[in-house]
Design a protein with these regions (language model features):
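N-terminal leader/linker segments that initiate helical-solenoid repeat arrays
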Residues: 21-78, 86-87, 95, 292-300
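Terminal, low-structured helical/coil segments at or just beyond the last alpha-helical repeat
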Residues: 26-32, 235-300
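Helix-start (N-cap) detector for alpha-helical repeat units in TPR-like alpha-solenoids
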Residues: 40, 74-75, 107-109, 142-143, ...
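Position-specific recognition of the canonical hydrophobic site in helix A of tetratricopeptide repeat
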Residues: 51, 85, 112, 119, ...
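Structural signature of tandem alpha-helical TPR/SEL1-like repeats
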Residues: 54-61, 87-99, 121-133, 155-167, ...
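Structural marker of alpha-solenoid helical repeat scaffolds
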Residues: 69, 102-104, 137, 171-172, ...
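Canonical tetratricopeptide repeat
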Residues: 79, 113, 147, 181, ...
């Protein structure tokens, strides 16, 4: 099911990552001689908020300044790992987290970061072991629970995934990211109404979350609600919404409707739309095969 959704262009979300250029000096400042001074709690909180708000340039600049003044503060090393992870630099993040995973007050978060990084690197077995260690250390580590849910989901261990997502939702006050991830798992299981409920809840928490909106449209289309699935799509998103609806129609073996939707997607694009063209070709071929199969059965 996930492969199909990828072809359809539906957005997937396992862990929220945004990539950007590293701020100069951040990841080299640890080479300075140890400084016994600690950063102010307010400074640490400001850097964390900047990372949480995806203001990575601000976070990088503030972190660089803090490290210059208090390079001995292990909390800053942890934040450097968090910033690397948020930017998609998993290997670099691993190095940072490993430096502080023996610090008692930081161990839970460091193990969580290592586990998420391992998951992003595709080292699934190691990731699961590390993430389980993280939640054993800190049962409220919701990002570790979310990543565990994603790992179990990938392996179609639905019961464990459901339990992990439940922990993540409880400890994160119903994070929209976790709601979206659980919704996509349920979509994969054809639990369409439950998936739609999760996507709607995610959008209520974060109305500007495109992955949840795209997944909601896909779930509606999978129910055969094609018009509803593309209703309200912005002009720049309409072609993709129609393509996704068309692919959902293919999965439903509704080939005639699929061809109509995919043709509309190509027109809405205003130019060549390779994905919609490939899906249209697939719909036509499957329709031909289906008709031929039906004819064979009728002759028997």
């Amino acid at each position: 099911m996930r492969r199909y959704a990828n072809l359809a262009g539906a957005a997937l979300l396992l862990a929220a990552l945004w990539c950007g250029p590293a701020a100069a000096g951040i990841f080299g400042s640890s080479d300075k001689s140890a400084d016994p001074l600690l950063a102010a709690d307010q400074t640490v909180d400001q850097i964390q908020r900047a990372i949480d708000d995806q203001r990575y340039l601000d976070a990088g600049q503030a972190l660089d300044q803090a490290l210059a003044a208090a390079s001995g503060d292990q909390r800053l090393v942890l934040l450097a790992g968090e910033l690397s992870l948020a930017r998609g630099h998993a290997e670099e993040a691993m190095t940072r987290f490993k430096r502080v995973d023996a610090v008692p007050t930081l161990r839970g978060r460091a193990l969580q970061g290592e586990g998420i990084a391992l998951s992003l690197l595709g080292r699934s077995n190691e990731a699961v072991a590390m993430l389980q260690a993280a939640v054993a250390e800190d049962p409220s580590a919701w990002r570790a629970w979310n990543a565990l849910g994603c790992e179990f989901d990938r392996h179609r261990d639905w019961q464990k995934a459901e339990a992990a997502y439940s922990h993540a939702l409880t400890d994160s006050d119903n994070s929209p990211m976790v709601l979206n991830n659980r919704g996509f798992m349920r979509l994969s299981q054809q639990r369409l109404d439950e998936a739609i409920s999760d996507f709607v809840a995610a959008l209520q928490k974060k109305p500007d979350m495109p992955t949840a909106r795209n997944n909601l449209r896909l779930a509606m289309a999978m129910k055969g609600e094609y018009s509803r699935s593309v209703s309200g799509a912005a002009s720049g998103d309409r072609a993709a919404a129609l393509n996704n609806a068309g692919y959902a129609a293919i999965l439903r073996q509704d080939y005639g409707e699929a061809k109509k939707l995919l043709d509309q997607a190509m027109k809405a694009k205003g130019g060549y739309y390779a994905m919609a063209a490939a899906n249209l070709e697939m719909a036509a071929a499957l329709e031909t095969d289906s008709s031929a199969g039906a004819a064979d059965v009728s002759r028997r």
